[in-house]
């Protein structure tokens, strides 16, 4: 395996997931490039006024990082937390959660699956 691999923006690919509304998802690297294929880095663009996800789970641990905008994070316990630019949240595997864009601009979130 190479010691490093550069991925240019024209090499990214977009995809859709059923639980995501008004959301553009972009995979930022090929998971096969990571030893063991266990790390996935994606970027989510949530449109203003309600773009987001339904409650969903991931089989892997996740880290969400808000790169731009304001997102309302809700965990399975119903607690809501406003996430703003620079905030992050660690999510245990198989934990239900959802996020909603509550700002007036497109929100951008980096998603790291471990």
Annotate each language-model stretch with its function.
Residues 1-38:
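A short, N-terminal "cap"/entry segment at the start of jelly-roll beta-barrel domains
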Residues 27-30, 40-58, 80, 93-96:
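Conserved short histidine dyad/triad with adjacent acidic residue
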Residues 45-47, 57-73:
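Short, conserved beta-strand element in jelly-roll/cupin
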Residues 53-55, 73-74, 91, 96-104:
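Short beta-strand His + acidic residue motifs that chelate non-heme Fe in jelly-roll/DSBH
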Residues 76-78, 102, 112:
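Surface loops and adjacent helix of pleckstrin homology
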Residues 77-93:
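Short acidic-glycine-tyrosine-enriched beta hairpin
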């Amino acid at each position: 395996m190479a010691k490093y691999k550069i991925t240019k923006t024209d090499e990214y690919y977009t995809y859709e997931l059923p639980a995501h509304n008004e959301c553009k998802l972009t995979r930022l690297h090929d998971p096969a490039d990571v030893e063991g294929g266990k790390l996935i880095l994606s970027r989510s663009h949530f449109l203003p006024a309600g773009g987001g996800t339904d409650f969903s789970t991931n089989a892997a641990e996740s880290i969400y990082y808000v790169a731009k905008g304001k997102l309302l994070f809700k965990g399975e316990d119903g607690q809501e937390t406003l996430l703003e630019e620079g905030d992050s949240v660690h999510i245990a595997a198989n934990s239900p959660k959802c996020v909603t864009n509550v700002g007036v601009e497109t929100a951008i979130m980096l998603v790291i699956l471990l």
